[in-house]
A protein has these predicted regions:
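Beta-strand-connecting loop/turn residues
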Residues: 10-11, 19, 102
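Conserved catalytic submotifs in the C-terminal HATPase_c
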Residues: 8-9, 49, 104
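Amphipathic alpha-helical interaction surfaces in cytosolic regulatory modules
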Residues: 20-97
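General small-molecule cofactor/ligand-binding pocket signal
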Residues: 4-6, 78, 100
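Short beta-strand/loop segment at the start of cytosolic alpha/beta domains
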Residues: 1-14
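A charged, well-structured terminal subsegment
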Residues: 101-121
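Short beta-strands and strand-loop turn motifs
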Residues: 14-15, 47
Length: 121
């Protein structure tokens, strides 16, 4: 499993280069993502185009990554394979993450979104 990382116009775009996120790959996936995703106000897009299978451990890894962001910007996903999109819908993960059909749509939405501001104490 590899992760292609591009910092584009203040948005962190991460393309997962693997076919599966299952029990065998979830730990590696989470480790790669945690190194790339530092809690920041930067918009983050996770491109899952090459993933054609995800199980509960993969979903758990995504939730864990979202929670690790704390007050930072919400994670966005894009380019879901139809089988992966079905799993997201059945598990209601489509209500947890913003999902876009393409990377271009996700990047356009991220660039149009107002800057995220953390609550000041």
């Amino acid at each position: 499993m590899q992760l292609k990382i591009i910092d584009q116009s203040g948005c962190l775009y991460l393309k997962v280069q693997a076919e599966r996120i299952d029990a065998a790959a979830a730990i590696q996936f989470k480790d790669l993502m945690r190194r790339a995703l530092t809690p920041s106000l930067q918009q983050k897009i996770i491109d899952l185009e090459q993933i054609n299978f995800i199980d509960s451990t993969g979903l758990g890894a995504l939730i864990s990554l979202q929670k690790a962001q704390q007050n930072a910007a919400k994670l966005t996903t894009c380019s879901l394979h139809p089988q992966v999109a079905k799993v997201f819908k059945l598990t209601r993960m489509d209500e947890v993450f913003d999902i876009y059909a393409t990377a271009e749509a996700a990047l356009k939405a991220a660039s149009a979104a107002p800057a995220f501001k953390a609550d000041e104490d």
